[in-house]
Regions:
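A positively charged, amphipathic N-terminal helix/segment that binds anionic biomolecules
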Residues: 18-33, 84, 88-89
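Negatively charged, low-complexity tracts enriched in Asp/Glu with abundant Ser/Thr
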Residues: 1-25
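Mixed-charge, Lys/Arg-enriched low-complexity segments
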Residues: 48-91
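Intrinsically disordered, low-complexity N-terminal regions enriched in serine/proline/glycine
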Residues: 23-24, 38, 52, 74
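A short, structured beta-strand/loop element
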Residues: 31-55
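Residues in flexible loops and secondary-structure boundaries
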Residues: 9, 14-15, 30-34, 64-67, ...
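A general marker of short, structured functional hotspots
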Residues: 7, 20-21, 35, 63, ...
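Amphipathic, alpha-helical segments enriched in basic
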Residues: 1, 16, 41-48, 58, ...
Length: 91
């Protein structure tokens, strides 16, 4: 079963000056009938009526590592479009 928890929100402006609202989520999957946990991330971006998101489940089984990743994603205002590239560099 997958749970999703909001960890960070961030308000920035795009290069064109348009307000952009970002939300960073922790994805938590129970494995082996609840005996193990696996963590991932999801980013939601909203500008006006438009929304886009990207999520990558099951990145790590270490809780401290995923929180470090989510903190860094929010700090650097990573968007859904760049999540895959950033994660490849992080791994």
């Amino acid at each position: 079963m997958r749970n999703k928890s909001l960890i960070h929100t961030k308000h920035i402006k795009t290069q064109e000056g348009t307000p952009l609202h970002l939300e960073y989520y922790l994805l938590n999957d129970s494995l082996l009938d609840g005996c193990a946990e696996c963590y991932g991330v999801e980013i939601l971006a909203q500008t006006g009526e438009a929304q886009c998101y990207a999520g990558i489940p099951r990145i790590t089984m270490r809780g401290t590592r995923i929180f470090t990743l989510i903190d860094q994603l929010a700090y650097f205002a990573v968007t859904p479009d760049s999540l895959q590239d950033v994660l490849q560099d992080w791994l």
